[in-house]
Every structure is written in C-alpha cells, then in structure tokens.
C-alpha cells in the first residue's frame, strides 16, 4: 500500500529547475533510499515532502504530493503535516536543553502538558531510539553533553515523540563514526516495523544494507526506482550502472 505518492512534481528555485517530473510511490512500513550525486535533487525532494521549502525565496512547486490520499500542499496545514511527518537531519541538532525536554518539546507544542503523559512519551521514544538505557539516569542533564551518535539517536527520539506516520532522514549518519553509524542503521531497520522511512544517503552500501527500495536521482530526475536488490544487481538504465559502479559521482 502506498503511504506517499509523488505525482508529476516539478520544483524551481527561481529559474533553476531543481526537480523534473518526479513520480514515486513510497510504500507503507518500508525503507526507501534516495541516492545520487551531490545536487541531484534528492534532499530537495525530501524537504518538499514536509514543506521545508515553503520559506525558500522564489521556490515554486507544481504537481502533487499526497500522504494517505491527502494533498500535502492543499489539504494539510503545516502543523498537521509536521505531526504526521518527522525529520532527522544530517548533523545532530539537539536543542540546548535537557535530554527530557528535547524529547518532550514536540508533544508540548501539540498541547500535551501532563507530567505523567510526558514521562511515558519520553521513555517510550527513547526506548524506540535505543537510547533509554544509556540516559535514563541523566534525563535532566544537558543534551549537548552527549556523544555525536547519542545526539543523533536523541534527534530520532524527538522526531518519534509526536508519533509520525513517516520519518524522513537526510544523511543521518554522514557525521558519525562507523560504530555509531551501525547503531543508527540497526535502529532504522527496527523502526520500519512501525514507520514509513525515507532516507537520503551518499553511502550506496548503506542503501543496500537497510533499504527495501531505492530511487536514483540525476540532475533533478528520477532515473530509476526499483527494489534495492534489483537496482544494484541488475540496473535497467546505463546511467544507474555507471553511478553504482563508480564511473561518476
């Protein structure tokens, strides 16, 4: 079942045509990877899904993005959308507050103020992010004192606290060491039991390890979209083969 449908999407930054007639069906409770060289449009599309491009000057979008049949730009207001679609960025970005308050920030924003309820949400979210056992005795210490890998898992917990349907991840391990990267990858695989996940990655081995489907972007176009095992073992487009075999990129 398709969770997200992207139909005939074009995006312009002024005169620059950043996304060109993008069409993708993203399945529920699967991990979909976006790969491609820098500047190919993969992060631009990710940010279009939860309307982070709204504040970009001279950004124009045509076409449709629907989430469970509702048009992201025409039927959902921004608060509804951000509750349904969580985002994790390339560089860990914990807020300058306690671990507890980082996770509770979203629920409080959406009107939850009961301490008992917030306690439950914080514990559940940190457990989902495989972080609870490491921080349960220092919840009220600053999040800025955590390691980089812990900070990124905290950012994942913060995104999960509002119980989104979709989790967007923009190169979530690119700033992390190999051990922290492995922990995040294991976590992402576990999370797909409950969430639809879209991940942008420059690491093709990572896409192979964790994703169910992969879309290859080049110069604003989706060149190929297929099951990950098929795209990497038997690409249908010569440009895909050239990219995954290292001939460019």
Curated annotation (Swiss-Prot):
UniProt keyword annotations, A-Z: ATP-binding, Cell membrane, Membrane, Nucleotide-binding, Phosphate transport, Translocase, Transport
Record: residues binding ATP: 36-43
Gene Ontology biological-process entries: phosphate ion transmembrane transport
Annotated function: Part of the ABC transporter complex PstSACB involved in phosphate import. Responsible for energy coupling to the transport system.
Quaternary structure and partners: The complex is composed of two ATP-binding proteins (PstB), two transmembrane proteins (PstC and PstA) and a solute-binding protein (PstS).
Protein name, UniProt field: Phosphate import ATP-binding protein PstB 3
Topology of the protein relative to the lipid bilayer: Peripheral membrane protein
PANTHER family attached to this UniProt entry: ABC TRANSPORTER I FAMILY MEMBER 17
Localisation: Cell membrane
């Amino acid at each position: 079942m398709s969770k997200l449908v992207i139909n005939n999407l074009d995006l312009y930054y002024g005169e620059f045509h950043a996304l060109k007639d993008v069409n993708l069906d993203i399945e529920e409770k699967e991990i979909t990877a976006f790969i491609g060289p820098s500047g190919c449009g993969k992060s631009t599309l990710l940010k279009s899904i939860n309307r982070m491009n709204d504040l970009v000057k001279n950004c124009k979008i045509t076409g449709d993005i629907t989430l469970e049949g509702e048009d992201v730009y025409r039927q959902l207001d921004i608060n509804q959308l951000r509750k349904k679609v969580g985002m994790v960025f390339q560089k860990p970005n914990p807020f300058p507050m306690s671990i507890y308050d980082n996770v509770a920030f979203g629920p409080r924003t959406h009107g939850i103020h009961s301490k008992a309820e917030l306690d439950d949400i914080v514990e559940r979210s940190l457990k989902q992010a495989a972080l609870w056992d490491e921080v349960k005795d220092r919840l009220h210490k600053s999040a800025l004192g955590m390691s980089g890998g812990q900070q990124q898992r905290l950012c994942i917990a913060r995104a999960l606290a509002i119980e989104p349907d979709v989790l967007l991840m923009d190169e979530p391990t690119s700033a992390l060491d190999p051990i922290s990267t492995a922990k995040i990858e294991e976590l992402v695989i576990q999370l797909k039991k409950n969430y639809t996940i879209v991940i942008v990655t420059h690491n093709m081995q990572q896409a192979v390890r964790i994703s169910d489907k992969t879309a290859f972007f080049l110069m604003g176009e989706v060149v190929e979209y297929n099951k990950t095992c098929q795209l990497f073992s038997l690409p249908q487009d010569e440009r895909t083969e050239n990219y995954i075999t290292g001939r460019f990129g």
